[in-house]
Swiss-Prot record:
Keywords: Cytoplasm, Heme biosynthesis, Iron, Lyase, Metal-binding, Porphyrin biosynthesis
Subcellular location: Cytoplasm
Known function: Involved in coproporphyrin-dependent heme b biosynthesis. Catalyzes the insertion of ferrous iron into coproporphyrin III to form Fe-coproporphyrin III.
Pathway info: Porphyrin-containing compound metabolism; protoheme biosynthesis
GO BP annotations listed: heme biosynthetic process
Coiled-coil boundaries: none
Binding site for Fe(2+): 189, 276
Domain of life: Bacteria
Enzyme class name: lyase
Organism ancestry: Bacteria, Bacillati, Actinomycetota, Actinomycetes, Mycobacteriales
PANTHER family membership: FERROCHELATASE (PTHR11108), FERROCHELATASE, MITOCHONDRIAL (PTHR11108:SF1)
Name of the featured protein: Coproporphyrin III ferrochelatase
């Protein structure tokens, strides 16, 4: 079943990855993330060190609560009486617990916002699997909710225009003598090439990486930049497995060796400044740039903005059939389905494309993907 319901929705669930909020939560969180994937305990120990460096706290839950508060405000401003719930795949508040609370509150027909703009297994299909898991959990409790996932929004006009403004804000922070020559670089989470090849339906062809590239082109056009780069970050797994390249730090080094003195780095693939952004970009990239006397301005993420909250409510109104779907891109923007149904036959391959995202950076045991 893949049909959209009209305006009978009675709740919104913000569904995310999850992250620890204290030292004692780090190890069990990492064990949840990597359950059944054969990650050695010593590898988890290495990753845990970086969480403890930040007080054992991933910023993702606080950032999602900020998004929820903004969405609630926007819903109220448009006279939507829609309660907002929060659930995570890997840590508290867990998605099954959120689903139970929703059912106890009488919710019957809920919308789901996954905190990802993209297609592909990790960006979309895995959230559909989470929805299937919540449905099974509710059935075991004698309860039921119909869940409708909101679509991928990588090319929504508000996403593009807000990211463009944030890029312009970063250019404005550069020294006058470097502003005109600064190179614009977009970055998103790397995934194995096999997973990217399987992203979307078979006819889509590498939907994840092509969506990232199209979004980057749309943002650059809005900024007025014609020459830019799209690179990747936070890879994990065996170094022998091909992933999307080049890596952001490697790319920055290469540009610097060719004489580039300034970069504007836009983490287009990330909704919020979660652990991968503050570790891979604000720590590793900045440290390398400082060694080379290279100026890097990292663009803010879209999640905390009022415009992102407005985007979310636009998607809700689209699902309610009260608003025309607004898109700037030409690629498929899938992801909207009922009760975790795939977007189409063969969508995002199979479970063999799952990736354990414990170490988002090949150089060191960086924090998990949250």
């Amino acid at each position: 079943m893949n049909e959209r319901t009209s305006d009978a929705f009675d709740a919104l669930l913000v569904l995310s990855f999850g992250g620890p909020e204290g030292h004692e939560e780090v190890r069990p969180f990492l064990e949840n993330v990597t359950h059944g994937r054969g990650i050695p305990p010593e590898r988890l120990d290495e990753v845990a060190v970086h969480y403890h460096h930040f007080g054992g706290i991933s910023p993702i839950n606080a950032l999602n609560r900020e998004i929820i508060a903004n969405v609630e405000k926007e819903l109220a401003s448009r006279d939507h009486k829609l309660p907002v719930y929060f659930g995570n795949r890997n840590w508290k508040p867990f998605d099954n617990e959120a689903a139970e609370q929703m059912a106890d509150d009488g919710v019957k027909n809920a919308l789901v916002l996954a905190t990802s703009a993209w297609g592909g297994y990790s960006g979309c299909r895995q959230y559909q699997e989470d929805i299937q898991g919540m449905i099974k959990h509710l059935e075991s409790q004698g309860q039921s909710i119909t869940f409708t996932k909101l679509r991928q929004f990588y090319d929504h006009p508000r996403f593009v225009s807000t990211m463009a403004q944030l890029v312009q804000d970063s250019y404005a922070k550069l020294p006058d003598e470097l502003r005109d020559e600064a190179r614009l670089v977009f970055t998103a989470h790397s995934i194995p090439l096999t997973a990217d090849n399987a992203a979307g339906t078979p006819e889509d062809g590498s939907l994840y990486s092509t969506q990232v590239k199209e979004a980057s082109a749309l943002i650059a056009e809005a900024v007025g930049v014609s020459d830019f780069d799209v690179v990747w970050q936070s890879r994990s797994g065996s170094p022998h497995t091909p992933w999307l390249e080049p890596d952001i730090v490697d790319h920055a080094v290469e540009l610097n060796e060719k004489g580039q003195k300034a970069l504007v780095v836009c983490p287009v693939g990330f909704i919020s400044d979660h652990m991968e952004v503050i570790w891979d970009l604000d720590s590793e990239l900045m440290e390398e740039a400082e060694k080379r006397n290279m100026v890097v301005e990292r663009v803010a993420t879209v999640g905390p903005t009022d415009e992102f909250a407005a985007l979310v409510v636009d998607l809700i109104e689209e699902a309610e059939l009260k608003r025309v779907i607004e898109r700037l891109g030409k690629l498929p923007a899938r992801g909207s389905s009922v009760n975790g149904a795939p977007c189409g036959d063969g969508c995002c391959g199979t479970a063999k494309h799952k990736t354990a995202r414990v170490n988002p950076n090949a150089r060191s045991a960086a924090p998990a993907a949250n």
